[in-house]
């Protein structure tokens, strides 16, 4: 590979590196989640469906984060009256019941990536009312959202485990969600608003993993290419110096040979004893 072709390849890789770089720092886009929720009260031997409602929220979803919190407000909604009536019918042995909020999305929730196969959104969670919130004018829902590959086949039921005098824990999918503690209490003045806290859990490990692998391979490739380029330049400089020195040596050798061929012939004088004359002889050097 010639030096010109090598430089062209290096420039092309650097340009590709610069073009791919903004993809890792782009601003998240707005996504609207429209959910249809159903409140269900779970008792040890029966299940009571409560009122349903719709919920819409504009969220800034960042695929690089696995968990996000979205807060929405539903004014003028309260199903706690019917829920309280159901709880009043419980015997004194089990003075508590659990509420499971099951939600499903109406629109497209393919917000993680085009490669994401999830087409549905199922939420599970609970109503949790603490003693300090006994006279609170709002109902508080703490809901966990999980992307599901096939929400139709997913089991959205909650199995309560009742213990007298204690909060009831819902045994849910241990892979996707964690168990939550739920307490059924009576609240007053619940006609004003309902606060929904959504903890969105996105399955983005596969997407971010491929992005990180591509990023690291690209950085490593550019780094190795830079090292090869530096080594190539060093060897080229050494080769150029060696050629210059070899050329100078050849030039001086040719000049030295030219001077030897043009040397003058020397005369040798031999003297023979006993003779009054001297013999002059000439030796010619080729």
Curated annotation (Swiss-Prot):
Report keywords, A-Z: Glycoprotein, Membrane, Transmembrane, Transmembrane helix
Broad class of the protein's primary localization: membrane
Q: Which InterPro entries match?
A: TMEM156
Sugar attachment sites are 45, 54, 76, 142
Question: What are the annotated GO cellular component locations?
Answer: membrane
Q: Transmembrane segments in this chain: where?
A: 5-25, 215-235
- Side of membrane Extracellular, spans: 26-214
Question: So which stretches are on the Cytoplasmic side?
Answer: 1-4, 236-286
Membrane topology term: Multi-pass membrane protein
Where is this protein found?
A: Membrane
What the entry lists under PANTHER family is as follows:
TRANSMEMBRANE PROTEIN 156
This chain belongs to the protein called Transmembrane protein 156
């Amino acid at each position: 590979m010639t030096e010109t072709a090598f430089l062209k390849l290096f420039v092309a890789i650097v340009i590709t590196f610069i073009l791919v770089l903004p993809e890792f720092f782009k601003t998240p886009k707005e996504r609207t989640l429209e959910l249809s929720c159903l409140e269900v009260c779970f008792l040890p031997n029966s299940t009571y469906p409560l009122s349903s409602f719709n919920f819409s929220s504009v969220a800034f979803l960042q695929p690089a984060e696995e968990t996000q919190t979205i807060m929405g407000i539903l004014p003028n909604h309260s199903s706690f009256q019917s829920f309280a009536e159901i709880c009043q019918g419980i015997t004194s042995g089990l003075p508590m019941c659990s509420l499971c909020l099951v939600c499903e999305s109406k629109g497209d929730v393919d917000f993680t990536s085009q490669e994401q196969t999830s087409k549905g959104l199922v939420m599970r969670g609970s109503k949790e009312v603490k003693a300090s919130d006994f006279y609170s004018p709002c109902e508080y829902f703490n809901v966990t959202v999980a992307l599901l590959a096939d929400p139709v086949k997913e089991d959205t039921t909650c199995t309560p485990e009742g213990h007298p005098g204690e909060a009831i824990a819902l045994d849910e999918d241990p892979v996707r969600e964690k168990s939550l503690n739920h307490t059924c209490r009576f609240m007053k003045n619940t006609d004003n608003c309902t606060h929904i806290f959504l903890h969105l859990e996105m399955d983005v490990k596969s997407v971010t993993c491929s992005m990180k692998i591509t990023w690291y391979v690209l950085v490593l490739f550019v780094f190795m290419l830079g090292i090869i380029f530096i080594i190539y330049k060093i060897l080229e400089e050494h080769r150029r110096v060696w050629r210059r020195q070899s050329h100078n040596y050849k030039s001086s050798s040719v000049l030295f040979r030219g001077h030897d061929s043009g040397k003058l012939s020397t005369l040798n004088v031999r003297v023979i004893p006993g003779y009054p004359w001297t013999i002059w002889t000439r030796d010619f050097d080729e």
